[in-house]
Amino acid sequence: MAADAAPGPARTSFHHAGMIVAIPFCSVDAPDALALLEWIEVLGGVREHTCLLTLDAAVQWSTASAIAAAAQKSFGNVRIVSTEEPVEGWPAGPNALWLEAARFAQEQGQPFLWLEPDAIPLKPDWMTKLAAAYALLSPSCFMGHLYKTNSEKFPPVVMSGIAIYPPGAIHLV
């Protein structure tokens, strides 16, 4: 974390009913993460789930704390994890954040929804429906949108990053 950083919560095992909702952000995305959490509150919150704020080390602790306070209004549990060092650029930055969320989910033995700050839920029961749909799948399944690509840099079909990942996803990708 950045200069005004205080150490975040230690990664201790806890189990909370529901699913982990990982919201990743860097300093640039912080206002969008806050707006997303304010919108989730307007939709009625998702108290049965855990919010995992997954942030880049360059995010100021004061910013992370303010976003955590917003998350506490909608989620039953709020946790924060951070990269050890700032990671800039695409895809290195998002990939580093995803790895932090995947490590946390593995430690907790829970699946996680990777919800980027520009992925906006539309209905009050959005997370209940997603969690119920995922519960019907095998515990090691990935649940997300598949789409075709026309790039030589990617396989012909990829899954959108905004998806639900199994607890052991870090070892499956």
Indicate residue ranges for each PLM-predicted region.
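Non-catalytic N-terminal targeting/anchoring module and adjacent flexible stem/linker
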Residues: 1-16
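Short loop->beta transition adjacent to catalytic acidic/histidine clusters or analogous donor-positioning motifs
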Residues: 17-20, 43-53, 76-78
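A conserved hydrophobic helix/loop-capping motif in glycosyltransferases and polysaccharide synthases
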Residues: 20-32, 56
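Short, well-formed alpha-helical segments that are part of the catalytic scaffolds
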Residues: 28-44, 62-66
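Alpha-helical elements of Rossmann-like donor-binding domains used by nucleotide-donor carbohydrate transfer enzymes
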Residues: 35-39, 66, 96-100, 125-133
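Active-site-proximal specificity loops/subdomain of glycosyltransferases
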Residues: 54-109
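Conserved catalytic core of nucleotide-sugar-dependent glycosyltransferases
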Residues: 91-94, 119-173
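Short beta-strand-to-loop acidic/aromatic patch adjacent to the donor-nucleotide binding site
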Residues: 109-120
